[in-house]
Amino acid sequence: MKTSTVIFGGFFMADNGERIQIPVLENPDIREINRFFSVSNFEKKAGVLVFRIIPEPKFGHTELTVYFEKGYYLPMIQTILEDGDIGVENLKTENYSVKTMEIWGDFYPIEHISKNISAIQNIISEFIRQKQTPAPMV
């Protein structure tokens, strides 16, 4: 049986507007990710974090992308469904209010966005832990 690998990378914007590439990590553990969050001061920055499962499974979670801007986080998990379709899971998938918030120039229901960095770290931890086990987000 092949084992899967989680690849982590991304970028953030420095205060001077420069794009800072995050070094790619293979199979990061949650301590590395938490340490990265603690030293990066993300609540004042904008950027994108990507966790990708390689090789891509036939079905299940394949990628977690976390968009962040000014202390707000938008996690999105891409999932290959058993019928081969692609789905995206967010923090909340039904009963939206009409309120939206702009993240990286696009508007999203506020229910998809969180200021709670601990919740985002838990989502990342769960994604890394389960790798390709299909499961709903918290």
Predicted feature residues:
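Acidic, proline/glycine-rich low-complexity IDRs
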Residues: 1-45, 76-138
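Amphipathic, interaction-prone secondary-structure segments
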Residues: 38-84
